[in-house]
């Protein structure tokens, strides 16, 4: 094994050791034991929310421990693989060792990104809202494509998704949609996706096949917990009920099960129609409303800090990524410069590279 390989392996060991220290592997094992005991409690599922929280946290903790242990095992095996390559004098074995070293660096660096999620709410689950912007029916179709992209990403990671509300456009696509991603660190991970996403393509809705630019906004909020003390007095809330509707305005329910909540002091409106009962829809809508009120509170606090620092801050809704399907194919993040020439894979949920680059960019900016 040459000196460059030795230096690279030593560098990987330093990075992985830092990851293990930040994740507190011994503490992680203790946490798994505690969660396993809680999961074994026969009364756990008397409280559905608590049961889901414990099982989700346990699955995530076990996954993190498994990943970091696998990385350590692979790194320990790497020098042995190079020794076998030297003894065999077989170029294919050397190539195998080199390929494993490159892949191992990618995997360790991806795990390192997880340690950068140290914000106050980063550990939370996420509430994601997608809204179509300028571009008419193309924008509505684009919003639905983005929704599918994020749901496919969550499914690839085995994160449960709960759709609260989908407002369908008349011709195609959606006006807006709100859904939750139930996974620890979902908020910290997806928060870098917030902003305006731009699509350039030949419009499938234009009979002259002209190129169309469409926009959609992505909003990512942390799920509210009881410790956030987001209390909503009954007098501040207006509750309206109506029948759920599907694509083209078709009624999908014969009862008034859909719920619209209006927070009177702020004018924030939340709707939910995807659950089967009015009560379930109201509970889901309240969760989204609380998340939006928490975000409003955070924005006010950030504005105060920016005023003290003389910093204008970054505004929500700024264009952050461009997806070009025609005349060439490219997806490029305008903040990080990270780009991929395979839009089909990205729109099918392969966005980890963009997320990792976004988290690193955010940490450098905040430093």
Curated annotation (Swiss-Prot):
Locations listed in the record: Cytoplasm
This protein's GO CC annotations: cytoplasm
Entries under Pfam families matching the protein: PCRF, RF-1
Keyword Transmembrane helix: no
UniProt entry keywords in alphabetical sequence: Cytoplasm, Methylation, Protein biosynthesis
Entry PTM: Methylated by PrmC. Methylation increases the termination efficiency of RF2.
Residues found modified as N5-methylglutamine: 250
InterPro entries with a match to the protein in the record: PCRF, Pep_chain_release_fac_I, Pep_chain_release_fac_I_sf, PrfB
MF terms (GO), sorted A to Z: translation release factor activity, codon specific
Highest taxon in the source lineage: Bacteria
HAMAP family, per the entry: Rel_fac_2 (MF_00094)
Its biological purpose: Peptide chain release factor 2 directs the termination of translation in response to the peptide chain termination codons UGA and UAA.
Family as reported in the entry's similarity comment: Belongs to the prokaryotic/mitochondrial release factor family.
UniProt cross-references to NCBIfam families, sorted A to Z: prfB (TIGR00020)
Cited PANTHER family: CLASS I PEPTIDE CHAIN RELEASE FACTOR, PEPTIDE CHAIN RELEASE FACTOR 2
Name under which the protein is recorded: Peptide chain release factor 2
Gene: prfB
């Amino acid at each position: 094994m040459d000196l460059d390989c030795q230096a690279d392996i030593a560098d990987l060991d330093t990075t992985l050791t830092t990851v293990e220290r930040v994740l507190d592997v011994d503490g992680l094992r203790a946490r798994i034991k505690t969660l396993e005991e809680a999961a074994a409690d026969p009364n756990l599922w008397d409280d559905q929310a608590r049961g889901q929280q414990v099982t989700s946290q346990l699955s995530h903790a076990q996954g993190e421990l498994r990943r970091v242990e696998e990385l350590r095992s692979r790194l320990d095996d790497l020098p042995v693989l190079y020794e076998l390559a030297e003894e065999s004098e077989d170029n294919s074995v050397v190539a195998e060792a080199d390929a494993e070293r490159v892949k191992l660096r990618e995997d360790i660096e991806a795990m390192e990104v997880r340690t950068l999620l140290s914000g106050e709410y980063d550990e939370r689950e996420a509430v994601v809202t997608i809204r179509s912007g300028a571009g008419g029916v193309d924008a509505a179709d684009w919003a639905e494509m983005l929704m599918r992209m994020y749901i496919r990403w969550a499914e690839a990671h085995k994160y449960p998704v709960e759709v609260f509300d989908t407002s369908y456009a008349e011709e195609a696509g959606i006006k807006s949609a709100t859904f939750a991603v139930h996974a620890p660190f979902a908020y910290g991970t997806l928060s870098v996706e917030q902003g305006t996403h731009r699509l350039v393509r030949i419009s499938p809705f234009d009979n002259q096949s002209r190129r169309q630019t469409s926009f959609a906004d992505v909003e990512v909020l942390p799920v509210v917990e009881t410790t956030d003390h987001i209390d909503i007095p009954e007098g501040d809330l207006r509750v309206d009920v109506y029948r759920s509707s599907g694509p083209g305005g078709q009624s999908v329910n014969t009862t008034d099960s859909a719920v619209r909540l209006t927070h009177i002091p702020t004018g924030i409106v939340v709707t939910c129609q995807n659950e089967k009962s009015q009560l379930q829809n109201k509970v889901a809508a309240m969760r989204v409303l609380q998340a939006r009120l928490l975000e409003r509170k955070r924005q006010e606090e950030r504005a105060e800090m920016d005023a003290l620092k003389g910093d204008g801050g970054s505004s929500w809704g700024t264009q952050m990524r461009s997806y070009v399907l025609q005349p060439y194919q490219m997806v490029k993040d305008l903040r990080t410069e990270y780009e991929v020439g395979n839009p089909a894979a990205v729109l099918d949920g392969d966005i980890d590279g963009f997320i990792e680059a976004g988290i690193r960019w955010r940490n450098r900016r905040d430093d």
